[in-house]
From Swiss-Prot:
Transmembrane residue ranges: none
Source species of the chain: Drosophila ananassae (Fruit fly)
Residue positions where Phosphoserine is found in the record: 803
Identification of the protein by name: FHIP family protein GF15501
Low complexity bias spans: 808-824, 942-973
Length: 1041
């Protein structure tokens, strides 16, 4: 080895250390003599070739000798490739020596083919020889890129060794080398698609030649066409660890190749078993998931990325699900459609359906709450993880399918669980619905809400013309602010000298008190970037504007606009014509002859008289609209489903027809221009004598029922509940606004309206928590505790391990069970007994990285401070105290509302956003004030933890937290305890001290619970007021465009 100069002796190893060759340092070109390197390479091959020729059945020493010489040859090739910096392919011209003489010798002497032929006769030593061959191919492919694949002396033995590997079971080290080589080949083919035929068609030709020559057995696939690289990768698709990841990456490259080469797509779809293998494997991995998730906190409501990493079975399942999602994104349309069909028929319906419904021989399990919680948590995780619209459509179809489960829809079963008496099941269900609403899917919104609201029967006839008006939104903002409990108004008045101005004027300089308390940095919107955004109406306005804009952007893709517009339905033309004749006859008899023509003052009086008729009679048939009975618009049909009619087209044709006739839509007629109304027709499409109320659907009934028990719910349930209702208010749909944001519209439903419930809540809090010194003290403590909790949640999201929260984590875990059980005796102590903060680092696998937005935007900073993760805090639980009741007069009113939906129990949850879009899902990490939401989608997004101001549920704790397991308070839903809660939100021991302060505060536990409700209700009303104001801005903008 004289060709190696001083300092390069470490470049060659002994035969006993061949496995470490690749790790030895290779010096620069000046450290070796290329000629000596070439001579040594030829010498080693001559010695190896002598052993190959003279060994009949090779002995152990023979194989060891060949492997040793091959090891030296690999090292010399590596030195040469580093010397050249690139591979110079063999040239046919004799002008000058080749740049890589060792490689030239390897190809010209057909060494690789001779080596393969000998390896087939090595018997039990075949794997050792194959391993060295794979190392050699891996080295050459990685350094030569695509150039060597064009040469038959290299390609032919490579195809032979790959063909002989089909259907074989290899040891782990050999499998690893094989997958690495296949991965490298896929990368090369992706960059050089023109070489694809070498492995797609030529591979089969080579195999047939081998079969004819008898050199290798025929492939076990039995197909007439074979993409050998893809076939070898299929068995490793569900493997764990790095081997499985590399195999799936290579398979995805093959799927992407199918977009560029239709023959590959046809082969994968028709001749390979990848689609059924993926689906059956996904179902098998789902069956291995824990049937009952370990819960260690009272506020747990969804699976987080940390939970995924700490549950091995869940990690494998999410890997497989993410791979399916990626295949649908990049594969050929034929493969995509086949995989979606297999997913629906082979996994979603037969596996997820029974798991969610929890059925056994057609009967529901009676006591399987834990299994239902787990199944719904898995479904929520799936919906937040997938982003491909085609796959999301399959899951939406699954929720709405009424044929696969004996006429029972999955969506209806989920709605029923909102009424479950189990608190954990309610929160998990609401977390799932928050995810579903975050998809902004038209079909889901239609089934949950819009199909019950489109007829407009929930609004009295005399109020229906107000639905699309804009002015009342501003008065609605004032209405929400007036609903604040009296004790909160008094507390706000007392704190005015120390508080930030509600409406700062541009150019105002914050006072020293403001700067000291909150911070002196203000942005363009007047929102400070200091410590807390509590009670800052500008922050709510900013958040509402951003959320409404995002929701509006996603809803632009809907097929229909869903603005209320009562037109006759299909097939009712003759009935309506007869009704119109009756109306004209009625007015001709009592109002004079001739058509109903009004102008100036007469028109205004007549219009008012029609309104008074509707208000006094109560009949919903007296609906009026300015339309020409002879216009083509009267024959337009109103679709109650998205598939029947495109409302946007109808609306445009209607508007054009009205404009041509000089008439205006009712929602464009203000008080000042009623004299422009020239013709009014009554709509008798409904029964003239229809009476009673209508249903808003089971979903809203369940939500309203839970809202009626606001003062008896736990703090976490109320936080999630307000978040879900807030999400509904973000939708730019006047029909939904008529229920939530329009205080001037009367609702005639079978349950109390939203605004009636808010009034009752205000009355109840005012009656049970009067404005006294003790009440103000409790309010101040509750408010301070929630703000303190907000700070801790912000620190947790920042992952600051040096924060007090991280230090308190260790202290909280050190608490003995007796101490934690003692804390559970109080509803407030239950909050402090939950799992403390865990500042966990980012895991290797994060199923939410898609929606993780690392930008430090102003909106992110604002919303992060308003994050409402469901951490137990110094605040108190809102669980009702036994024996507490409202005052006598108020209790009768309250009993009326609670009795109407006494069985409705629900809870709200935060979710993050992937959009149907998701869908999005979306998108970035979704955080909001006083509400929870999904991103998106965002959304596999590592920051998918859902946050909301003043409380909510964080997603940072693992499913196997070491914290002591706690149980739901027996007062939450009248239950004797409940299943253990799985902590999704961190809490520090700071809350323990706050709890002690609250516990020592004068007043009963009921009054302390009401104080928390009052603080939360006050902040939520501000948020609703901000949403109402911003919705008016959006509607005005729409009309001006």
């Amino acid at each position: 080895m004289s060709w190696l100069r001083q300092g390069s002796s470490g470049g060659v190893a002994s035969a006993g250390h061949s496995g470490n060759i690749r790790q030895r340092p290779i010096d620069a070109a000046t450290d070796c003599d290329p000629r000596a390197c070439y001579d040594s390479f030829c010498k080693h091959w001559q010695q190896a070739h002598e052993i190959i020729q003279h060994s009949a059945p090779p002995s152990h020493d023979d194989v060891l000798g060949v492997v040793s010489h091959l090891d030296y040859m690999v090292t010399l090739l590596l030195v040469e490739l580093h010397h050249c910096n690139k591979v110079a392919l063999p040239t046919t011209e004799a002008s000058g020596p080749p740049a890589a003489p060792c490689l030239e010798y390897l190809l010209s002497e057909n060494l690789l083919d001779k080596l393969y032929e000998w390896s087939c006769a090595t018997g039990r030593y075949a794997n050792a020889v194959r391993l060295e061959q794979l190392k050699l191919y891996e080295l050459l492919v990685s350094h030569s890129r695509h150039q060597l694949l064009c040469h038959e002396p290299f390609l032919r033995p490579l195809l032979k060794i790959l063909a002989s590997s089909q259907g074989e079971i290899f040891p782990p080290d050999l499998e690893k080398r094989l997958v690495i080589l296949l991965n490298q080949l896929c990368v090369v083919l992706m960059q050089n698609v023109h070489l694809l035929d070498l492995f797609f068609f030529s591979a089969q030709t080579q195999v047939q030649e081998q079969i004819q020559n008898g050199s290798v057995p025929p492939p076990k696939s039995g197909t007439t066409t074979n993409f050998i690289i893809f076939s070898l990768l299929i068995p490793y698709v569900h493997r764990e660890g790095s081997l499985g990841h590399q195999a799936r990456d290579a398979l995805l490259l093959c799927m992407a190749l199918s977009q560029k080469n239709s023959n590959i797509g046809t082969y994968i779809a028709q001749y390979s078993s990848i689609c059924p293998l993926l689906v059956t494997g996904l179902g098998g991995l789902y069956s291995r998931l824990p049937n009952s998730i370990e819960i260690s906190a009272i506020d747990w409501h969804r699976i987080t990325p940390d939970d995924v990493t700490e549950i091995p079975e869940l990690t494998l399942f999410m890997n497989a699900l993410e791979f399916c999602n990626a295949v649908v994104q990049v594969a050929h349309e034929m493969i995509k459609q086949q995989l979606l069909d297999f997913m629906y028929q082979g996994f979603i319906v037969p596996v997820l359906g029974p798991a969610i419904l929890q059925t056994l021989k057609g009967k529901h399990f009676q006591t399987n709450i834990d299994s239902q919680i787990s199944a719904m948590s898995y479904l929520d995780l799936i919906l937040r993880s997938i982003t491909e619209p085609g796959l999301l459509r399959a899951f939406v179809r699954f929720l709405l399918d009424n044929e696969k489960f004996d006429g029972e829809r999955i969506l209806d079963a989920l709605v029923e669980r909102l009424n479950s008496p189990d608190a954990n099941l309610c929160m998990v269900t609401l977390a799932l619905f928050d995810t579903l609403l975050g998809l902004h899917c038209e079909d889901l919104m239609l089934e949950l809400l819009l199909k019950f609201m489109l007829p407009g029967k929930h609004v009295p006839l005399s109020h229906r013309h107000k639905i699309n008006k804009i002015d009342p939104y501003l008065s609605s903002s004032e209405f929400f602010l007036e609903l604040s409990p009296d004790v909160m108004k008094r507390a706000r008045d007392l704190a005015k000298p120390k508080a930030i101005q509600e409406h700062p004027v541009v150019g105002d300089i914050p006072s020293p008190v403001m700067s000291k308390t909150i911070g002196a940095n203000w942005n363009y919107y007047g929102v400070h970037t200091g410590d807390s955004l509590y009670a800052n109406i500008q922050a709510y306005l900013f958040e509402a504007h951003w959320r409404i804009a995002q929701c509006q952007k996603d809803c632009l893709k809907w097929a229909n606009s869903y603005r209320y517009q009562k037109w006759p339905r299909h097939g009712q033309g003759r009935v309506q014509a007869h009704a119109l004749d009756l109306a004209r006859q009625f007015f001709s008899e009592y109002g004079g002859s001739g058509p109903v023509v009004a102008s100036g003052e007469t028109g205004e009086k007549q219009l008012d008289s029609l309104q008074s008729i509707g208000e006094s009679s109560g009949y919903e048939s007296f609906k009026w609209r300015p339309a020409d009975e002879e216009s083509e618009a009267t024959e337009t049909t109103l679709a109650t489903t998205a598939s029947e009619v495109e409302l946007e087209h109808n609306s445009s044709s209607i508007s054009s027809g009205l404009a041509a006739s000089g008439r205006r839509e009712p929602w464009r007629i203000s008080h000042n221009n009623r004299n422009e109304l020239v013709l009014t027709d009554l709509d008798f499409s409904e029964d003239l004598f229809a009476q009673g109320t209508v249903s808003l659907g089971p979903f809203l009934n369940a939500i309203w029922g839970k809202l009626q028990t606001f003062t008896s719910n736990s703090l976490y349930v109320n936080l999630h509940l307000t978040g879900l209702i807030t999400r509904l208010a973000w939708y730019p749909l006047p029909l939904i606004h008529s229920l939530l944001l329009r205080s001037d519209i009367v609702i005639t439903s079978d349950t109390p309206s939203f605004h009636q419930v808010l009034r009752i809540l205000k009355q109840q809090i005012d009656a049970e928590l009067p404005v006294t010194e003790d009440s103000l003290e409790i309010i101040d403590v509750a408010r301070s505790s929630l703000i303190d909790r907000e700070f801790r949640l912000v620190n947790t999201r920042k992952g600051n391990e040096g924060s007090p929260s991280h230090h308190n984590l260790q202290q909280q875990q050190a608490l003995n069970p007796a101490q934690q059980q003692g804390q559970q005796r109080s509803a407030y102590a239950t909050l402090s007994a939950a799992t403390p903060v865990q500042a966990t680092p980012t895991s290797a696998y994060d199923p939410f990285r898609r929606s993780d937005n690392k930008r430090r935007s102003i909106s992110k900073s604002i919303t992060s401070m308003f994050s409402r993760k469901s951490a137990p805090t110094a605040a108190a639980s809102a669980a009702p105290a036994n024996g507490s009741s409202a005052s006598s007069g108020l209790s009768q009113i309250y009993a009326f509302f609670t009795g109407a939906a006494s069985t409705l129990v629900g809870s709200n949850s935060s979710s993050e956003s992937r959009g149907f879009a998701p869908g999005q899902q979306s998108a970035g990490t979704c955080e909001t004030s006083l509400s929870t939401q999904p991103p998106r989608p965002t959304t596999i997004a590592s920051g998918s933890s859902s946050n909301s101001s003043m409380g909510g549920s964080s997603q940072t704790l693992s499913a196997h937290s070491n914290a002591t397991t706690t149980h739901s308070s027996s007062t939450l839903h009248g239950l004797d305890g409940g299943p253990p809660s799985f902590s999704s939100e961190p809490v520090s021991l700071d809350s323990v001290a706050s709890m002690g302060i609250i516990a020592s505060t004068s007043g009963t536990e009921r009054s302390r619970d009401l104080a928390l409700c009052a603080v939360l209700l006050d902040e939520w009303l501000k948020e609703l007021a901000a949403i109402a104001q911003e919705q008016s801005v959006v509607l005005v903008t729409e009309q001006t465009l």
